[in-house]
Amino acid sequence: MIIHVEENYEAMSKKAALIVASQVVSNPAGVLGLATGSTPAGMYKELVDLFKEGIIDFSQITTFNLDEYYGLPKTNESSYYTYMMENLFNHINVPLERVHIPNGMAEDVEKECLAYEEKIRNAGGIDLQILGIGANGHIGFNEPDHKLSMKTHLVELTEKTIQDNSRFFQKEEDVPTKALSMGIGTILGAKKIILMANGKNKAEAIKEMTNGYLNPMVPASMIQAHPDVILIIDKEAASLL
């Protein structure tokens, strides 16, 4: 694992964007695994700027998002589909038929999860996976548990995650209690992983995920088993290392 400690959120975002841009330039028909939330938003802004400057071209890129809320229509302003459209896809030239986000309104959830895994396999696997990390150590929506799911699955969100995500909704009661998420095995199947974190509220999770122990109660710690991981964090998130 390579660890980059940056001065602040802006520097962290720029660093991550440059690594993603390099990946796109070197493999213009590659597959990106994408994350949502407040952490990668700055990186997406940087990528949009690089696209507008003519430095990168997304026309052959394929994308797979980590997760989506279950029971939330994609047209909902708090859906991850809406997030991705507003923060990235509306501003670059990736063909929407190459964009994949789990269908949170699927009637047959098991079928949707199996189909998502198959789409990833048919695309040749994920070349670069972007991750954030929850304050409780979750990645995607893989919550702390004694037994982690390996493949895309339906997950019950913890009270901590629901509270943390309530800032994206008008009321905490509006936050979905379930989500579809890539599993730990799906994430570890990516050829390269970038995990980003900023802020003091992520410092404990960063300490726990880099201590050398693979602990299912800290799902992010599992990426220590991956041969090509880049951790990009700001000074506050690195404060307990």
Swiss-Prot record:
<dbReference type="GO" id="GO:0006046">
    <property type="term" value="P:N-acetylglucosamine catabolic process"/>
</dbReference>
<dbReference type="InterPro" id="IPR004547">
    <property type="entry name" value="Glucosamine6P_isomerase"/>
</dbReference>
<dbReference type="GO" id="GO:0042802">
    <property type="term" value="F:identical protein binding"/>
</dbReference>
<feature type="active site" description="For ring-opening step">
    <location>
        <position position="143"/>
    </location>
</feature>
<feature type="active site" description="For ring-opening step">
    <location>
        <position position="136"/>
    </location>
</feature>
<dbReference type="GO" id="GO:0004342">
    <property type="term" value="F:glucosamine-6-phosphate deaminase activity"/>
</dbReference>
<dbReference type="GO" id="GO:0005737">
    <property type="term" value="C:cytoplasm"/>
</dbReference>
<protein>
    <recommendedName>
        <fullName>Glucosamine-6-phosphate deaminase</fullName>
        <ecNumber>3.5.99.6</ecNumber>
    </recommendedName>
</protein>
<comment type="similarity">
    <text>Belongs to the glucosamine/galactosamine-6-phosphate isomerase family. NagB subfamily.</text>
</comment>
<keyword id="KW-0119">Carbohydrate metabolism</keyword>
<keyword id="KW-0378">Hydrolase</keyword>
<dbReference type="InterPro" id="IPR037171">
    <property type="entry name" value="NagB/RpiA_transferase-like"/>
</dbReference>
<dbReference type="GO" id="GO:0019262">
    <property type="term" value="P:N-acetylneuraminate catabolic process"/>
</dbReference>
<dbReference type="InterPro" id="IPR018321">
    <property type="entry name" value="Glucosamine6P_isomerase_CS"/>
</dbReference>
<feature type="active site" description="Proton acceptor; for enolization step">
    <location>
        <position position="67"/>
    </location>
</feature>
<dbReference type="GO" id="GO:0005975">
    <property type="term" value="P:carbohydrate metabolic process"/>
</dbReference>
<feature type="active site" description="Proton acceptor; for ring-opening step">
    <location>
        <position position="138"/>
    </location>
</feature>
<dbReference type="InterPro" id="IPR006148">
    <property type="entry name" value="Glc/Gal-6P_isomerase"/>
</dbReference>
<comment type="function">
    <text>Catalyzes the reversible isomerization-deamination of glucosamine 6-phosphate (GlcN6P) to form fructose 6-phosphate (Fru6P) and ammonium ion.</text>
</comment>
<comment type="pathway">
    <text>Amino-sugar metabolism; N-acetylneuraminate degradation; D-fructose 6-phosphate from N-acetylneuraminate: step 5/5.</text>
</comment>
<dbReference type="Pfam" id="PF01182">
    <property type="entry name" value="Glucosamine_iso"/>
</dbReference>
<dbReference type="GO" id="GO:0006043">
    <property type="term" value="P:glucosamine catabolic process"/>
</dbReference>
